[in-house]
């Protein structure tokens, strides 16, 4: 389930993250309750992206956060 940022307080969550090729522009940052949902969001975003920024696989990942909003681990999507 997709979460708003204010809903993430006190629970672990996964953030779907995509940066452009340069690493200067974040194209996606959405929070989900499961890793699979977050990975699916990244894949769907890339599949449907119509913008002008270049997306590379190493800048597409899912970041896991704990209940205190500390990053635990990053997971590759591609």
Which role does the model predict for each range below?
Residues 11, 37, 73-75:
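Extended rod-forming repeat segments used as scaffolds/tethers
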């Amino acid at each position: 389930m997709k979460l708003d940022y204010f809903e993430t307080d006190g629970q672990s969550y996964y953030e779907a993250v995509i940066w452009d090729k340069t690493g200067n522009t974040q194209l996606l940052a959405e929070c989900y309750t499961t890793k699979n949902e977050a990975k699916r969001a990244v894949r769907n975003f890339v599949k449907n992206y119509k913008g002008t920024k270049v997306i590379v696989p190493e800048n597409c990942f899912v970041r896991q956060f704990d209940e205190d909003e500390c990053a635990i681990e990053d997971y590759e999507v591609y």
